[in-house]
Amino acid sequence: MALKKFLEDIEHHFEPGGKHEKWFALYEAVATVFYTPGLVTKKSSHVRDSVDLKRIMIMVWFAVFPAMFWGMYNAGGQAIAALNHMYAGDQLATVIAGNWHYWLTEMLGGSISADAGVGSKMLLGATYFLPIYATVFLVGGFWEVLFCMVRKHEVNEGFFVTSILFALIVPPTLPLWQAALGITFGVVVAKEIFGGTGRNFLNPALAGRAFLFFAYPAQISGDVVWTAADGFSGATALSQWAHGGSGALINNITGAPITWMDAFIGNIPGSIGEVSTLALMIGAAMIVYMRIASWRIIAGVMIGMIAVSTLFNVVGSDTNPMFNMPWHWHLVLGGFAFGMFFMATDPVSASFTNKGKWWYGILIGAMCVMIRVVNPAYPEGMMLAILFANLFAPLFDHVVIEKNIKRRLARYGK
C-alpha cells in the first residue's frame, strides 16, 4: 500500500500542467505494472465488468508459461546431452570455461555432466532464454514508451504479450543484438506506425521474426542454431522429414528414432516455446476457456491443415517426402501448434466476425501445409501462413458484413 500511496502522491506532477508532464507515459507504464488503472467508461453505452485490457494480457502472458518452462528445460537438456556426446574430461572443462552460459550454470550450483538433473537443465536453458526475453522486453518497451510520449497517450499492456511471444519463437542461440533488432521491427514497423495497440493489421511478434528470417537467415534457420552446444549441428525433426521422410526422424545426439510422442511432449530441438505441443495445449485451454482466444479460429486452422495434408497424402510423391506427412505429424512438428494457439488467435490481426474466423483459420491451416510441402527451400510454413492470412482478415470480415446487410434487406425490405 505504501507504493500505491507514493504513486498517487506524485501522479499530479505527471498530469497535464505538471512539471513532469512530458514523462506521463513513462509514469503510467510503471504504475500500471503494479496496479490496475482506476479508469472506467463514463458515457453510454457500455457494460462494466472486472476484465480490462491489462487483465486479458496478463492471462495470455501466464498461459504461455507451461511452454516457456518446458522450452527452457528442453533447451538446457538438449545442450547438456550434446556437450557430453562430443566432449569429455579436460576437453569438456575447457568448453565449459569458454562459454558464459555453461560456467554460469555451474557457478549457480548446476551441472553440465551427463547425469545433470532437471534443475540443472532448467538453469542452463534459462541462461539462454532469459537474456533474450530481457533484451526484447527492454528494447520493445523503450519503443512503446517513446511512441506514447510523442503521441501523449497511455502505455498499453499489449507489449507484455508481444515480448514473450517473440522471445519464445526464436532459437535459443539467437544473438541478443538480433533479438533487439527483430523486436524493433515488429513494434515500430508492424505496430506503432499503424497507430499502436489495436490498430496493427499484422502480428508484431511474427513480423519481427519474419524480418530476422529474411535479413539474417543463418542465425534463425538451418541446422546449427537449435541446440545450444558449441560446435554441434543438428537438423530439426521437420527438416529431417523434408529431406528423408519419416524414416529420417532420428535424435541427432543418440541416433534413436524420434517417435510421435517425443515430438508431442517436446523432446526435440526447436525454437524455445514451440517444441512441446502438450504444454501449448495446456496454455491454450486456459485462454479458450476464458474466451480470450477464439475456438473457431483454432478449429478452422485444424480443418484447413487436415484437409490439405490429407489431399497431399492421397496425391503422393516419389520425390518429395513432405507429400506423405500425415496431419498428426504436422500438428507436433515445427511451429504449427504455437502459431495456431497463440499467434493466429491474436484478436487484433485476426478476423472479428464469427464466419470470418472460420475462413481465416482454414486459410492459415491450408497455407501452412502448402508452404511446407510445395516450397523446397522452407520446410516451416506457419509464420508466413499467419502473416498472409492477416492480410485477408479484413476482406473476410467485409464479405461477411456485406452478406449480412443484404440478407437483412431482403428479409425486412427497404
Curated annotation (Swiss-Prot):
Reactions mediated catalytically: a ubiquinone + n Na(+)(in) + NADH + H(+) = a ubiquinol + n Na(+)(out) + NAD(+)
Q: What is its main location?
A: membrane
Cofactors:
FMN
Localization per record: Cell inner membrane
Give the UniProt keywords, A-Z.
Cell inner membrane, Cell membrane, Flavoprotein, FMN, Ion transport, Membrane, NAD, Phosphoprotein, Sodium, Sodium transport, Translocase, Transmembrane, Transmembrane helix, Transport, Ubiquinone
Q: Which InterPro entries match?
A: NqrB (IPR010966), NqrB/RnfD (IPR004338)
Q: Where are the transmembrane segments?
A: 23-40, 56-76, 129-149, 164-184, 268-288, 297-317, 325-345, 358-378, 381-401
GO cellular component labels: plasma membrane
According to its UniProt entry, the protein's GO biological process terms are:
respiratory electron transport chain; sodium ion transport; transmembrane transport
Q: What is its EC number?
A: 7.2.1.1
Membrane topology annotation: Multi-pass membrane protein
Q: Which GO terms describe its molecular function?
A: FMN binding; oxidoreductase activity, acting on NAD(P)H, quinone or similar compound as acceptor
Modified sites of kind FMN phosphoryl threonine:
236
Complex formation: Composed of six subunits; NqrA, NqrB, NqrC, NqrD, NqrE and NqrF.
What does the UniProt function comment say about this protein? NQR complex catalyzes the reduction of ubiquinone-1 to ubiquinol by two successive reactions, coupled with the transport of Na(+) ions from the cytoplasm to the periplasm. NqrA to NqrE are probably involved in the second step, the conversion of ubisemiquinone to ubiquinol.
Against PANTHER family, the record matches this protein to: ELECTRON TRANSPORT COMPLEX PROTEIN RNFD, NA(+)-TRANSLOCATING NADH-QUINONE REDUCTASE SUBUNIT B
Q: Which family does it belong to?
A: Belongs to the NqrB/RnfD family.
**Protein name, per record:** Na(+)-translocating NADH-quinone reductase subunit B
